[in-house]
């Protein structure tokens, strides 16, 4: 469960955003445009949430935060899209990085797997100062789960608040509070 660097993309492989389109290929067979077609930014954001909340050091390959696509080398080394960045993805990265910075348990806390199921994963990061439960639903519909957050130190009388919610059409930083 320990890793040194949490990478979704790097200079040796196709970019993670491209991999969300489920196309395996190279530019010489499919063309560079195919790397950008059918991408799933919701899945990309789910990956970034795991990257930023898992143990280890999250490492962003330049351009991932701006929505750069690309098949395997050399296509994955496209230039940074100065002035044409995906502003929603940039904002998302800034917000999730801020959450990591503001919540020590996401940087140095213990990790505990919670409830997991088909297209669903949940785990907790916690220390003596705080607890975060991370729930990722990759289904195409809402699901209901009972998560035993007491396992990560949330008191039975405690409250939890959704601080980030990602959807197909974007994300929001406002959420409901649960008891």
Could you say what each language-model-derived stretch is?
Residues 1-58, 115-118:
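Alpha-amylase-like alpha-glycosidases and glucanotransferases acting on alpha-linked glucans and related
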């Amino acid at each position: 469960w320990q890793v040194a660097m949490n990478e979704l993309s790097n200079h040796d492989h196709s970019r993670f955003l491209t991999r969300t389109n489920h196309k395996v290929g190279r530019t010489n067979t499919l063309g560079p445009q195919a790397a950008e077609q059918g991408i799933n930014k919701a899945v990309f954001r789910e990956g970034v949430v795991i990257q930023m909340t898992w143990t280890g050091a999250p490492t962003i390959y330049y351009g991932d935060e701006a929505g750069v696509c690309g098949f395997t080398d050399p296509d994955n080394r496209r230039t940074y899209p100065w002035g044409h960045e995906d502003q929603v993805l940039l904002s998302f990265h800034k917000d999730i990085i801020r959450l990591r910075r503001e919540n020590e348990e996401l940087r140095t806390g213990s990790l505990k797997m919670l409830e997991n199921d088909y297209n669903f994963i949940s785990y907790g990061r916690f220390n003596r100062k705080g607890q975060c439960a991370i729930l990722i639903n990759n289904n195409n519909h809402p699901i209901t789960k009972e998560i035993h957050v007491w396992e990560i130190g949330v008191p039975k009388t405690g409250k939890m608040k959704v601080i980030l919610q990602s959807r197909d059409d974007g994300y929001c930083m406002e959420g409901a509070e649960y008891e």
